[in-house]
């Protein structure tokens, strides 16, 4: 069943995610007008020039006039300020959703500032992205086959949740639902912590006196392990701040794992090390076969 | 200056590295006969069938008769036993080299068992590999543009070091020299530790009650961060055991870095986190531009 087109879509934060959502709905013939709003006038002008948005709004009053759907897609640290600023201008029927990598803080902002609007404020998180950021990298096909996690509120009207789900499905995405607490714990483990660990390794090496020498001999294993250390610092600062309790819990769990491996190394426990490595390898290979078109396979190249 | 062909090359451990060395020298017209030796008869037969080796030797006496060059390319944990076993059958002029990812243990084995042969026993480490292992994955082009680190002994005859260097150069490799201590410290930092960290993360998640759920939401950042967790457990067990002191030192350094980041998270220190992330990103991007044809770029996709 095809969902009906959005008359006016407002995208706050026209970067990779917001821009791709706009382009995907345009490609599907499911949006008549896209209005961009954001803190950077320059990036709104680029989005306009690229046809990602049809119009840039000067303020929330202008942006929200006649808006049917609003997607919040700026770094998660801005959520509360943005929700607070938009709230007074929101018409009763406008559907609000977001694309933040963390959910508890988004929900807190909704409860704080959208108290009368909770029927139509549906938190979401598309598990998609690319190496690039900014609206120049926006791509109508970005969400094809990717998961979008919705964490609906008890107050949400079922029709609003369905509408958000259908719009993402029209972008090619697969919908999952979770509680916000569960969402934030799961992504702390499989996404936020790995980012922190990769940043930590590169930072550690880069600050050494012999950093030049170390980097000269780093090869393909290092390349892949640290690829996410080139991620956007502000975005990841925000994720770390808003989800810091779950990330700390995951970090502490990981430190226990490292303490265990450290003991195996200290005691030169070959069978113990091989068992850990073999279990990890089996789990990684099973994951690769099941969840990704893992063209590059797994394994070392050093 | 083209180096002269090797009359008879012996490869111990005909896997990805040993097999690729044989194929590369064959492709360059620089070897007349390749003799394989190893603990697995089945893998020697596959290497024979694939034309990676010309003959499989039943024992070291047979393998070393008339051998001009020997490459040791089995997992590093076998080095001492292999060197001990070959020593009695080694003719005075035969050149011995190796491809181990660690060097101090190889040198210890040379000093222990090749006391009269040190002029011609040259330790080396090709920084190359691929996702696959085994002689089926052997590839004549594997070493093109890759570094090979030699860690010559004071006892080495300059002509022997030059000969080893020229053979690797004929495979397309770039030669570097380092002390074995420096080699083992550098690779503990940029290769061995990242492997341990990736194994640790996957092992940690795989052992949880909700492992299925966690893996379901893992995406591209996790894929690349953990690719090396699919590496060969025996090979990495051996590397961890023989280089455990350097790896422990690197692990402890990394644990200090994580303690620092943990403190930033605990205190919700946004500027501090952003500074670490921004420094890491700058270093990772500079590395990507300088050292790799980093087609995939860096950055997050979550």
Where are the language model's segments positioned?
Chain A
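Internal alpha-helical scaffold of NAD(P)-dependent oxidoreductase catalytic cores
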Residues: 142-227
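Interdomain hinge/lid region at the active-site interface
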Residues: 211-280
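Residues at the starts of beta-strands that form the adenosine-phosphate
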Residues: 8, 33, 120, 147, ...
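NAD(P)+-binding Rossmann beta1-loop-alpha1 motif at the extreme N-terminus of oxidoreductases
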Residues: 1-66
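Rossmann-like NAD(P)(H) cofactor-binding subdomain of soluble oxidoreductases
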Residues: 84-136
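Short beta->alpha hinge that forms the Motif I/post-I loop of the SAM-binding pocket
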Residues: 39, 74, 99
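Rossmann-like NAD(P)-binding element
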Residues: 60-90, 94-95
